[in-house]
Amino acid sequence: MGSGCSSPSISLTTIATSHFQSQESLSNSLNFYSPTRFLEPHLLKSSKIFIPKSPLKCAKVPEMQTQLEDSAKPIVDPHDIDSKLVQKLANDALVWCPLRGLLVGDRNSERSGTIPGVDMVHAPVALIPMSFPESHWKQACEVAPIFNELVDRVSQDGEFLQQSLSRTRKADPFTSRLLEIHSKMLEINKLEEIRLGLHRSDYMLDEQTKLLLQIELNTISSSFPGLSCLVSELHRSLLQQYREDIASDPNRIPANNAVNQFAEALAKAWNEYGDPRAVIIFVVQAEERNMYDQHWLSASLRERHQVTTIRKTLAEIDALGELQQDGTLVVDGQAVAVIYFRAGYAPSDYHSESEWKARLLMEQSRAVKCPSISYHLAGSKKIQQELAKPNVLERFLENKDDIAKLRKCFAGLWSLDESDIVKDAIERPELYVMKPQREGGGNNIYGEDVRGALLKLQKEGTGSDAAYILMQRIFPKISHSILMREGISHKEETISELGIYGTYLRNKTEVLINQQAGYLMRTKVSSSDEGGVAAGFAVLDSIYLV
């Protein structure tokens, strides 16, 4: 979660927020989990993969189907739930989580991130889903395939990536190393004939403008496809059990099948690679308390698609990996069909040259990368800012309606060489967020720190400003929620961020998959600027459509 709320909504006079006419109303019937799907939701038999007729065809998000006339009413305000009921909800959730696998490693245990099954605790969760407007839910789902296609097209424009990041390269060593690998692939004309994207586009709903605005588009290590599904099921279970007390309809929580849709895309890419003996390798961190989210995906691949997965760190891949003459990547004696990154997105993942050697080795191979180096760069903050400039989307997309739908989601984004914006940010820092080229929580700069950072960069005058962008600060509605972490629940004033997953796969002749693929809802205390769950700022949540 990248943009916090510390004051009532404030509009930016420097931002043009154009409204576009809505498209035709969307057709009927969302797919919801039925009661019969409750026991083993992640490992149900796969349905046929949806193959769109056109790469840019938007997913149609249908109307809700419920049996209750009053089902569109907002869920009860958690602030009004008495303490006895809160305790019942918490106790039932504490039993449900270990039974269903809604778990993370205990941050107080040294072994919890390295040894599976040891020192587990429930994932941090909200006990009641967050109300969310159905119209904005549909909007976010509808643009997911367009963003998928945009990432693919941007990734194929090496000149655009290199030029857009040229100043950033000089100011940010991490981006420079990524661009170095990208340049080497361009020099040898390395073509990715099979391209796989597992993305997540994160949004906040601005309270004053009522616009759904994009925080960022993640193209590497889009986390929580496994646990997010379980939170939706937990909330449906609790609302069903306490339906009379809470007076809500569990069917207003939309189906969330992200983990199986991720598995479908990975399995289809594995199949396209064409070697039934090859494996999918998960590139992971040496210590990973969120390993169970990853293991849910491995389980879905094994149970639904009979695909074997292995887990290796970048250092292990350097030590055990080799590239055969035909481009086959072999790690620890096993041929690799697909490389799925759950690490490698931050400088802290590269402890030495060993990790960089592993990244280059994988990029040189003919294995399908998720993401490739070009997909990784296409998701950088600087590229997000470049795409928000006038007439840049037109370089990659032809359909005017698609372009309008994406622009409607864009918040204000600026480089630090725009002097008028920098001046305004120094005068009114509360209206901006300063973002470095980093993934994961805890990196952004807020409030008075924005002014201090900008003045420092101006004084230094070394070009270090190219390592950052400025973004409009979004001020979402403050809502009440009940948050539970480490067995302790408490009511809080909170804000939320919606992430929409997308899956994209194409070979050299056609797009095989391009669709919205579930969601992630994260909720945090409204006074907190940052919002990553794994970083300890937020909890997992689900949405209740109103």
Curated annotation (Swiss-Prot):
Protein name: Glutathione synthetase, chloroplastic
Any one GO MF annotation of this record: magnesium ion binding
Compartments it resides in: Plastid, Chloroplast
Cofactor: Mg(2+)
Free-text comment on the cofactor: Binds 1 Mg(2+) ion per subunit.
Enzyme class per UniProt: ligase
GO terms under cellular component: chloroplast; cytosol
